Curated annotation (Swiss-Prot):
Glycan attachment points: 43
The protein's name: Thyrotropin subunit beta
Bridged cysteine pairs (disulfide): 22-72, 36-87, 39-125, 47-103, 51-105, 108-115
Assembly with partners or alone: Heterodimer of a common alpha chain and a unique beta chain which confers biological specificity to thyrotropin, lutropin, follitropin and gonadotropin.
GO molecular function, one term: hormone activity
Organism expressing this protein natively: Sus scrofa
Cell location: Secreted
Length: 138
């Protein structure tokens, strides 16, 4: 009985480590420009979750490509564009942002992802919010 229990625990641990929990997750962001009168709250999806990584002890003897770790990043995404209300005529009022359709564990691609871990920025509006959002798919 103990052997069966131990084997099932090891199997569960192995499957849990092999599975990725990197999925599209709902995210609310606030967008404002200093020249515009209003702030927009945008509901979108981002890639978030856990990816299996390993930290090697012999880092001095490995090439740099072997030291990079997988992150939760976009597999498929599309861009949406919104118009920020209350902008003067000389300011472009459009803001484009990615919407995650599916995610994967992989190397961070700087072409479409911010790969630098920064200090937490404030994610709130400092200006009045406008209640409507115009979206344009690109």
């Amino acid at each position: 009985m103990t052997a069966i229990f131990l084997m099932s625990m090891l199997f569960g641990l192995a499957c849990g480590q092999a599975m990725s929990f990197c999925i599209p997750t709902e995210y609310m962001m606030h967008v404002e420009r200093k020249e515009c009168a209003y702030c927009l709250t945008i509901n979108t999806t981002i890639c978030a979750g856990y990816c299996m990584t390993r930290d090697f002890n012999g880092k001095l003897f490995l090439p740099k490509y072997a030291l990079s770790q997988d992150v939760c990043t976009y597999r498929d995404f599309m861009y949406k564009t919104v118009e920020i209300p209350g902008c003067p005529h000389h300011v472009t009022p459009y803001f484009s942002y990615p919407v995650a359709i599916s995610c994967k564990c992989g190397k961070c691609n700087t072409d479409y992802s911010d790969c630098i871990h920064e200090a937490i920025k404030t994610n709130y509006c400092t200006k009045p919010q406008k209640s409507y959002v115009l979206e344009f798919s690109i």
